[in-house]
Amino acid sequence: MNLKKIRYKGDVEDTKELFDVYKVQQIIKSHEEILKEHITFREKLLADSVRLTPIISPRIYKIIETVKKDFGLKQKIEFFSLMENSYNAFAFKQKNLISVVFTSALLENFDDAEIKFVLGHELGHIIYDHNKLLLLYNPDKQSTTFLPILAEKKFLTWRKKAEISCDRVGLAACKKYEFAVQSLLKITYGLTEKNLNFNLPELMKQLDDLAKSEYMAELSTSSHPLLPVRLKAIELFSNSQLFKKSGKLTAEELHAKTDELLSLTKFYPRTKVKEMMMKLVAAGGISMIAADKEINLEEIKSLVKILADVFTDDPESEIIYDKDKALKQLETSEKYLKQHGTDIDRYYTLHFLTLISLSDGKFTKTEKEVLMNTAESIGLSKEDAMDVVWKTLQQNGITIDVRLNEIAQNVQEHYADYLKE
């Protein structure tokens, strides 16, 4: 099977964007240089785990050789067992040596076909060079990655798509959908067929119940898609012509259906009220930015950042460039929020708009008027609106120093002329 052809197109596209648009190769290269100064993880494995050679574990060696032959892999693979009671596995590559690590619990409780699925999945990350992008994770956990917000959004979206690609490689290794299902059920839920009668439509109902919850937005930062999504994606692939010639789905149909499935995991408002809050912030933010007759980049960046932080993976799609359409959206969302929103919804909407107004280092009379008009339109009294504005100012201050910007601009202009000489 051509592993390059079965890779999920969404994974390929997002990887390309991360490198071409966000230039992540510089961060990856820097991280690789830092890691060279530390003891390698392989050295730790040699000290803390057992390497399963053909003599020590002929069973595992046979599985590895079978999968290598099926995939046409020529690189050497070494296999480690790490003593741990949970089911887990990972792989990494140093030069031309691939190291695969399974926990002892997984090896003891998974049959050969299930191990093939997990092995194929982990090798998929190596084959598709995913592990380089994983160097973008920030190990100190203060932030998810080393990336700015929009790049991080793209990275987290890509991460889930990468898992879809590798699940396909896992299926290619174990050959049957049932084996892939059994493996993922054990890893995720700790359940076997003894206690679980697998029924994908029933599991998808669980996802349907969760889909309308705002908790789904929190799950958007997780590295893996929810299990029902993964199982459905594998089922789609197993019925495609990419997996078998007799498959019902063409490559294009598979891609479209997988895209639709993955959209369930995106970061986007799950309730109508929150969606209207987002649309009001998008349209109201632009209206306020334009009110001073001066389009300030700091205010625009603040608007986009708030949309990305609070509401959506794709903030640009919420910006309306047609003035009449933006005004109509503003009126519609204001009316909806007044009728259906809570005081908390109205408070935070005005809070976000206030943050945008402060982001250029000024708070003008015109901006205040726009905020007060918006407050009235969504059902906040003038007193409550001023309370929101004042508390936002107290909590966040004015982060842009106008005088500092003037100095920086003077220096920039001076040295621009100097460099021309």
Model-inferred region functions:
Residues 48, 55-59, 67, 71-73, ...:
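Short helix/loop segments within enzyme catalytic domains
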Residues 97-98, 140-149:
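Short, conserved phosphate-binding/catalytic loop or strand-edge motifs used
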Residues 68-76, 85-112, 129:
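Active-site scaffold of zinc-dependent metalloenzymes
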Residues 52-55, 101-117, 157-160, 340-341, ...:
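Short pre-active-site segment immediately N-terminal to the catalytic Zn-binding motif
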Residues 78, 132-137, 176-186, 319, ...:
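Acidic/histidine metal-binding catalytic segments
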Residues 1-74:
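A metal-dependent hydrolase signature that marks the N-terminal structural subdomain at the beginning
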Residues 151, 155, 185-220, 233-421:
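Small-residue-enriched hydrophobic alpha-helices in membranes
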Residues 108, 113, 122-139:
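Catalytic Zn2+-binding segment of zinc metalloproteases
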